[in-house]
């Protein structure tokens, strides 16, 4: 796109605090945004071809609340991203990310994290440091198991649909706020599903269709009645 068009977008963003430039074939993060590090609250560069975030620029958007780079070509995230202490929404669906920076747990205001359609091979332990996290979407990755660290996760909703999960730590039932757990289209045997999810957790919506067992078999597990009580109570609440 031409410089004048980009300049016009920058001028508008200066007034609104919102910079949105989608579907423009951008191959790099626009360096012109350096001028707006103290203005921007929202950046949306989805549906481009950006393969990296400039470390020296990205960490300076200290007022940024929402960052979207869905459908790009990102392979790594710089540590400097974790300087964004006001960031509440981070959406990086359909990139090529294999892991998160070790400092990711410093994004202390983060509420919504979308990483669907990446190449994550494990549940990132850094997520367990995020005390305000509400919604986590890790669907369509390559996660094979859920480790013990999951018990520290503060999220209300965890989407793990379309991974390769065959093992789940019993600690998942210790998540203090977890209400919605999506595990559709994984590699779970019924025997590998911790019964404590049904009997001893806060979970009131468990989605497990498309695994290696018939859904009706779930009803035979100990604790299913307790789960249905929570499920029904929640349904009534939103009816």
Curated annotation (Swiss-Prot):
Keywords: Leucine-rich repeat, Lipoprotein, Membrane, Myristate, Repeat. It is found in: Membrane. It is a lipid-anchor. LRR repeats lie at residues 39-60, 63-85, 86-107, 109-131, 132-153, 154-175, 177-197, 202-222. A lipid is attached at residue 2 (N-myristoyl glycine). Pfam families: LRR_1, LRR_8. SUPFAM superfamilies: L domain-like (SSF52058). The keyword Mitochondrion does not apply. The keyword Membrane applies. GO terms for cellular component: membrane. SMART domains: LRR_BAC, LRR_TYP. PANTHER family: LEUCINE-RICH REPEAT-CONTAINING PROTEIN 57 (PTHR48051:SF62), PTHR48051. This is Leucine-rich repeat-containing protein 57.
């Amino acid at each position: 796109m031409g410089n004048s068009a980009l300049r016009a977008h920058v001028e508008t963003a200066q007034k609104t605090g919102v910079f949105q430039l989608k579907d423009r074939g951008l191959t790099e993060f626009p360096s012109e945004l350096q001028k707006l590090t103290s203005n921007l609250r929202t950046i949306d560069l989805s549906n481009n071809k950006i393969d990296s975030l400039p470390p020296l620029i990205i960490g300076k958007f200290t007022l940024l609340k929402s960052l979207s780079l869905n459908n790009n070509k990102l392979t790594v995230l710089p540590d400097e991203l974790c300087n964004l202490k006001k960031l509440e929404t981070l959406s990086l669906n359909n990139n090529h990310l294999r892991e998160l920076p070790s400092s990711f747990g410093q994004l202390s205001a983060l509420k919504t994290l979308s990483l669907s359609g990446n190449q994550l091979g494990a549940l990132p332990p850094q997520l367990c440091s995020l005390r305000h996290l509400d919604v986590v979407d890790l669907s369509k990755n390559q996660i094979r198991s859920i480790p013990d660290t999951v018990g520290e996760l503060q999220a209300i909703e965890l989407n793990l649909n379309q991974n390769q999960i065959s093992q789940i730590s019993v600690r998942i039932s210790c998540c203090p706020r977890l209400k919605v757990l999506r595990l559709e289209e994984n590699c779970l045997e019924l025997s590998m599903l911790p019964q404590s999810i049904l009997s001893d957790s806060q979970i009131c919506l468990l989605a497990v269709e498309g695994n290696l067992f018939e859904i009706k078999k779930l009803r035979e597990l100990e604790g299913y009645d307790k789960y249905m009580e929570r499920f029904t109570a929640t349904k009534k609440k939103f009816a």
